[in-house]
């Protein structure tokens, strides 16, 4: 078929239009939220405590920030962190970026050891094995050694190295903050 002196293959143009339309309507990775909420903060706290707990704040002073960052081998943002306490038991809900998206995990610390750990929300598109209870259960009983590192080896997950590192950093931070929150704070009245 000749159109304006140019030979046109209508089938070629039709296929091109179909591919263009499919490209425009397909979901774009990263725009849709891949959020897997495994446990709410409220459910985690109910599991951590038998109903009674108080909300508290640990202040991140410059010297404590340096200690956190050195132990985590990573920066730490924020001036304060909310936590929950009943007696010697404290619960920490922390969030760190894995490879691309935030991961939310909860840690219960008692007597300078992790008593309970739970992955609360996982937003990454890869490394889904991190959501299995067997991975996060490795942190139970973990404490800090003399240089404020986890005292045990945590098995990684192929393809989820950054997510595993994020959870290890959160576990370390929860132990350090639990120790800091148990220390009486000097309050300046000036």
Regions found by a protein language model. Give the residues of each.
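N-terminal secretory signal peptides that target proteins for export/translocation
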Residues: 1-11
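Sec-dependent N-terminal signal peptides
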Residues: 11-20
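Carboxylate-rich, polar loop motifs that coordinate divalent cations or form catalytic acidic clusters
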Residues: 24
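Flexible, solvent-exposed loop/hinge segments and secondary-structure transition points
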Residues: 31-155, 161, 165, 169-190
């Amino acid at each position: 078929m000749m159109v304006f002196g140019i030979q046109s293959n209508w089938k070629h143009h039709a296929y091109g239009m179909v591919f263009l339309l499919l490209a425009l309507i397909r979901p774009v990775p990263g725009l849709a939220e891949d959020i897997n909420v495994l446990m709410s903060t409220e459910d985690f706290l109910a599991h951590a405590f038998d109903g009674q707990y108080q909300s508290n704040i640990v202040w991140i002073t410059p010297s404590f920030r340096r200690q956190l960052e050195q132990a985590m081998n990573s920066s730490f943002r924020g001036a304060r962190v909310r936590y929950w306490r009943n007696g010697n038991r404290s619960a920490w809900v922390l969030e760190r970026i894995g490879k691309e998206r935030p991961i939310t995990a909860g840690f219960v610390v008692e007597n300078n050891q992790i008593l309970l750990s739970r992955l609360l929300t996982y937003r990454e598109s890869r490394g889904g094995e991190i959501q299995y209870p067997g991975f996060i259960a490795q942190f139970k009983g973990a404490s800090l050694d003399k240089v404020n590192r986890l005292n045990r080896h945590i098995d990684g997950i192929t393809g989820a190295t950054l997510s595993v590192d994020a959870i290890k950093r959160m576990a370390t931070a929860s132990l350090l903050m639990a120790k800091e929150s148990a220390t009486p704070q000097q309050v300046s009245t000036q």
